[in-house]
Curated annotation (Swiss-Prot):
Gene: CBS
Protein name: Cystathionine beta-synthase
A single MF term (Gene Ontology): protein homodimerization activity
Keyword Ion transport: no
Location in chain, cross-link Glycyl lysine isopeptide (Lys-Gly) (interchain with G-Cter in SUMO): K211
Compartments it resides in: Cytoplasm; Nucleus
Regulation: Allosterically activated by S-adenosyl-methionine/AdoMet. Activated by S-adenosylhomocysteine/AdoHcy. Binds non-covalently to a heme group that may control the redox sensitivity of the enzyme.
Key words of the record: Amino-acid biosynthesis, CBS domain, Cysteine biosynthesis, Cytoplasm, Heme, Iron, Isopeptide bond, Lyase, Metal-binding, Nucleus, Phosphoprotein, Pyridoxal phosphate, Ubl conjugation
Family: Belongs to the cysteine synthase/cystathionine beta-synthase family.
Organism: Macaca fascicularis (Crab-eating macaque)
Residues at which heme binds: C52, H65
Entry keyword Metal-binding: yes
Length: 551
């Protein structure tokens, strides 16, 4: 993907962000060498420096933006879009007491929006602003790279307004989001989860490629669009102030694009200057400040919709008073707690936010108030953190947490299995040769290792064949082109019960063991080596053989 960063248009109002969507007829000049007529932008970086002119204390009359005023809701709504906004503020009664908070703890429940998340607000606002500017016209196509919730909001609005909608989202995102998007009539394109945001394979890169190929298409670009924070400045923040009678001492919000926390915080800084703004960023993301908070070996996380590997343009980190990092285990634990103890059917990022809130609000006293933003609903995660099996497989629940009667073999170790010597291939072996080896040896998959035996990834017969049939690779290409790293590992000391949970959702697990290697410098390092590959057939054969011997 080209690294050039075209400058966003700045209209006569001096709008600091891109004032509308990126259309296929945009005015950003970027074409082929020597082609002076070409004005087609290849892409615009979602982390371009912001040129926003907002300043605390600056009169609202000097704002270059169109601002909306909340309308009184009629008894009969003209369409579902009128059910976006005006979400309830609900008191948290048990969790605050459980963690010894003295202050009042309130939840702004954004999953009561029509599409089920806080992103409904920005989706509607971006489309309305684009329509008002004359950029988005009937019959046009909306394309958006998203983790899912913005896509649902856009697809919902597009269904009502009559636009074609294409959503580009990473493979990590839940199947429930995909199902909802399809039901709303959206077209869906999936991208690799581990692709960097600036690579052609990322959800951002693929969205821009589609935009450049499809006539009359537009990327509304939640990462750069001023309508994102403006939606929260004009509506969400005003609702919070009204619901709290202007009295709140702390606001806690998880951060993705940054539009929610930026818009709300700017309004609160103006109207309630004593309120502390707390930002929540998952471990593996780089949004938090100071930079030391982001230092970790972790690069992936399960919680969806928050955190990024770049700083979105719309995120104003200067309005955040303090950052906290959150992890997956506490996120899903607190999300389940909110459901079980408060009856709030919220998603995983709400758990991240609440987990941080009970830490940050320890400094507040009686008579003070903390507001927590709960971004989306549990609807999107029915097969994820709401599932005990999924939680067990991911290691967020322990076997003893579930009081079920286990079979006799449950607590035996993986080392009890009679695993054959592993078949491994080097990344330089051709796809054609690898397929021949797997067929000859009767295997469906094999670990890919380097010359030293260090695990690089896995390759499966099915994945190679589908890649060849789709023309993604040639038979002579190295197998390193089709390896993937999203597979489950298990150790010899793990239980067969844990293996069973993995095999309920995956076709195989890679059995590994640690090796300590000493270097000439006197230092040592630990690396994982392949011990074998185990499948459901291996487990079933072991159980059947043991029961046969006992008879």
């Amino acid at each position: 993907m080209p690294s050039e960063t075209p400058q966003a248009e700045v209209g006569p109002t001096g709008c600091p962000h891109l004032s509308g969507p990126h259309s296929a007829q945009g005015s950003l000049e970027k074409g082929l060498p020597g082609d002076k007529e070409a004005k087609e932008p290849l892409w615009i970086r979602p982390d371009a420096p912001s040129r926003c002119t907002w300043q605390l204390g600056r009169p609202a009359s000097e704002s270059p933006h169109h601002h909306t005023v909340p309308e009184k809701s009629p008894k009969i709504l003209p369409d579902i879009l009128k059910k976006i906004g005006d979400t309830p503020m609900i008191r948290i009664n048990k969790i605050g007491k459980k963690f010894g908070l003295k202050c009042e703890l309130l939840a702004k429940c954004e999953f009561f929006n029509a599409g089920g998340s806080v992103k409904d607000r920005i989706s509607l606002r971006m489309i309305e602003d684009a329509e008002r500017a004359g950029t988005l016209k009937p019959g046009d196509t909306i394309i958006e790279p998203t983790s899912g919730n913005t896509g649902i909001g856009l697809a919902l609005t597009a269904a009502v307004r009559g636009y074609r909608c294409i959503i580009v989202m990473p493979e990590k995102m839940s199947s429930e989001k995909v199902d909802v998007l399809r039901a709303l009539g959206a077209e869906i394109v999936r991208t690799p989860t581990n692709a960097r945001f600036d690579s052609p394979e990322s959800h951002v890169g693929v969205a821009w490629r589609l935009k450049n190929e499809i006539p009359n298409s537009h990327i509304l670009d939640q990462y750069r669009n001023a309508s994102n924070p403006l939606a929260h400045y004009d509506t969400t923040a005003d609702e919070i102030l009204r619901q709290c009678d202007g009295k709140l001492d702390m606001l806690v919000a998880s951060v993705g694009t940054g539009g929610t926390i930026t818009g709300i915080a700017r309004k609160l800084k103006e109207k309630c200057p004593g309120c502390r703004i707390i930002g929540v960023d998952p471990e593996g993301s780089i949004l938090a400040e100071p930079e030391e908070l982001n230092q970790t070996e972790q690069t992936t996380y399960e919680v969806e919709g928050i955190g990024y590997d770049f700083i979105p343009t719309v995120l104003d980190r200067t309005v955040v008073d303090k950052w906290f990092k959150s992890n997956d285990e506490e996120a899903f634990t607190f999300a389940r707690m909110l459901i079980a103890q408060e009856g709030l059917l919220c998603g995983g990022s709400a758990g991240s936010t609440m987990a941080v809130a009970v830490k940050a609000a320890q400094e507040l006293q009686e008579g003070q108030r903390c507001v927590v933003i709960l971004p989306d609903s549990v609807r999107n995660y029915m097969t994820k953190f709401l599932s005990d099996r999924w939680m067990l497989q991911k290691g967020f629940l322990k076997e003893e947490d579930l009081m079920e009667k286990k079979p006799w073999w449950w607590h035996l170790r993986v080392q009890e299995l009679s695993l054959s010597a592993p078949l491994t291939v080097l990344p330089t072996v051709s796809c054609e040769h690898t397929i021949e080896i797997l067929r000859e040896k009767g295997f469906d998959q094999a670990p890919v290792v380097d010359e030293a035996g260090v695990i690089l990834g896995m390759v499966t017969l099915g994945n190679m064949l589908s890649s060849l049939l789709a023309g993604k690779v040639q038979p002579s290409d190295q197998v390193g082109k089709v390896i993937y790293t999203q597979f489950k590992q298990i150790r010899l000391t793990d239980t067969l019960g844990r293996l069973s949970h993995i095999l309920e959702m995956d076709h195989f697990a890679l059995v590994v063991h640690e090796q300590i290697q000493y270097h000439s410098t006197g230092k040592s390092s630990q690396r994982q080596m392949v011990f074998g590959v185990v499948t459901a057939i291996d487990l079933l054969n072991f159980v059947a053989a043991q029961e046969r011997d006992q008879k």
